[in-house]
Amino acid sequence: MEELQGHRELDRSWQHNFLYPLIFQEYIYTFAYDHGLNKLILLENVVDQKYSLLTVKRLITRLYQQNHLIFSANDSNQNEIFGHKHKKNLYSQMITEGFAVIVEIPFSLLLISSLDGKEKKIVKSPNLQSIHSIFPFLEDKFLYLNYVLDILIPYPAHLEILVQTLRYWLKDASSLHLLRFFLYECRNWTSRITSKESISFXKTRNRRLFLFLYNFYVCEYESFFVILRNQSSYLRSTSFGALLERIHFYRKFKYLVKVKACAVILCFFKEPFPHYVRYQGKALLASKGTSLLMHKWKYYFISFWQCYFSVWSQPRRIYINQLSNYSLDFMGFLSSVRFNSSVIRSQMLENSFLLENIPNKFRSMGPISPLSGSLAKPKFWTELGHPIGKSVWTGLSDSDIIDRFGRICRNLSHYYSGSSRKKNLYRIKYILRLSCARTLSRKHKSTVRAFLKRLGSEFLEEFFTEEGKFLSLILPRDFSTSGGLYKGRVWYLDIICIHNLVNDQ
């Protein structure tokens, strides 16, 4: 008990540090716009990213002089605080990005303090950063489970809920007021985080701040798993003390369902403890228990969202499905658990008999419809799958056109390399080759048949050369086939995102 109390005091020690003065420090903005720490921001329009030390000094000087740090984005008749409109937008973005770095500091310190030397090395492992690391986990664990909850995590109903949840971790009132000021003054931001687009952050200008807020929201949503795990295993984990701030949720829950103590709620989930995975706004929770247990989980999820986040969740956000009769639509794959029956003949002395073995097998495949739709938007082919030339690329050289189509094919091959059935992937790549041929034939004002006849087999090899070289380094020579194609299953552990696999930049 003394160790638990000491850990709680350690966690609370950084909460009383004042973060607000850091917004007046120059090095904070250096961290915010460093290429290594802010890659997502640098993917946007480079013209608007002209920052310098002189600009930062001017911004800090104006922050000392002005009573307000930011202005309303929708008020056209307001007084100009930072001068020219372009500078106002620049300063506004600099403040928000700097503030995002500031609020990340306490959580980074908490993570570092909670890890020992071995775990720090594991965190730095590039393999664990790959989203493909989820699928080997599914293959190992989901084979022996019965039911799965297909969960769509609800979006925050109101921005004030995010500020209130952050208040339990961050005790600096000035920083919280500044965050609230950012969220409410810039009214056009409110739709960013309370809408469906908040998951991708593809077009959000201040995506780092909103990404932090959404990740913190999801972290709070997942925090009760630790409580249930500790209650189930009867272990006194030190992280349990940091979660005692959520006690007000159970107080609300008591009045809702007339439960006298938390132990009555937690005893529903003692055994068996389920397996949980999440990517972006979708989560899977699978268990070996019965259908009744999964309905209790669903009931707990809905009550948790309503009481803690004041979110009235719709029933269609949680589906209860049986793994043997259901395909999981997760991270661009259709995964399922199927029974493979096999008959084995065994002979002992003069007696022979047949044994029927029915093992479970985890299958995953790339769905053809979403892939076709994602490539139909940038006009690689029609919605019906008919290839059309990429007319905007006709001004490029032949090698650049082939290289762009080849990179798209290789990206798709890398991501869907773990598919059990690659027939759909081969169809997609075949249509991409025809689309590339149409683009080149349109550029040279020729027919597709004549162009393919002139290029020969070299044109097809451009789409598989890099993939074949990579596989030859990690697989024995026996696995190599003609044309560089490998029909086995390989999970690439260097993929950390999926949003740019198709829309090649």
Swiss-Prot record:
Principal location: plastid
Domain of life: Eukaryota
Gene Ontology terms: biological process: mRNA processing; RNA splicing; tRNA processing
Subcellular location, record wording: Plastid, Chloroplast
Entry GO terms, CC: chloroplast
Pfam families in the cross-refs: Intron_maturas2, MatK_N
Molecular functions (GO terms): RNA binding
Entry keywords, A to Z: Chloroplast, mRNA processing, Plastid, RNA-binding, tRNA processing
Function: Usually encoded in the trnK tRNA gene intron. Probably assists in splicing its own and other chloroplast group II introns.
UniProt similarity note: Belongs to the intron maturase 2 family. MatK subfamily.
The protein, known as: Maturase K
Lineage start: Eukaryota, Viridiplantae, Streptophyta, Embryophyta, Tracheophyta
Underlying gene: matK
